[in-house]
Amino acid sequence: LKQNNPRQILSMLSSQIFKKKPQNLIAVTGTNGKTSIANFYYQILKENKKKVASFGTLGISGKKKIESTSNTTLDPIKIGRNLNYLEKKKINNAILEASSHGLKQHRLDGLKFDVGIFTNLSRDHLDYHKTLKDYLNAKLILFKKLMKKGSIAIFDEDTKYAKILKNI
């Protein structure tokens, strides 16, 4: 099997192996605030008696126990396995933090999100992305490639990136 991007293949295979997922997938991306926004969203859904789980910097919550994680955005096998578990437990809302590394490394490929949230963008991770443009493009993968048709994008209209986000 010849493939230019084995990480993308791994994500697609994971999505096919672990087909069952919660009904509503929500992703949060941005330089700062991913964890806070994911946690706020989690608490709002939980307070409204929705079954919800959250994946990110704080680990995986919403299962019987909180599982710790080493990356903000898990590897595709762990994502698939955990989403499959949540669906079996009838948890139908999952919030995932989508880091620029995770997006650029295709860890979320094969998933389709109902809601995408963009918090902000500032100069960070340029050791990995090299330019601010590359960093922004990594964040935009969520909105360009991983959203369901008719999905919801949430972002600050006053951000200088609002025009770009509106035109996706």
Walk through the language-model features, giving the residues of each.
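Short beta-strand-centered segment that lines the nucleotide-binding/catalytic pocket of NTP-utilizing
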Residues: 49-64, 99
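Short, basic phosphate-binding NTP loop
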Residues: 1-29, 36-53
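A generic structural signal for short, well-ordered alpha-helical segments in conserved domains
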Residues: 38-42, 83, 166
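Conserved helix/coil segment N-terminal to the catalytic DExD/H
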Residues: 101-109
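Acidic, Mg2+-coordinating active-site environments of NTP-dependent enzymes
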Residues: 1, 88-92, 104, 113-168
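Conserved nucleotide-sensing/catalytic segment adjacent to the nucleotide-binding pocket
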Residues: 71-99
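Flexible beta-alpha connector loops of hexameric P-loop NTPases
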Residues: 66-76, 124-129
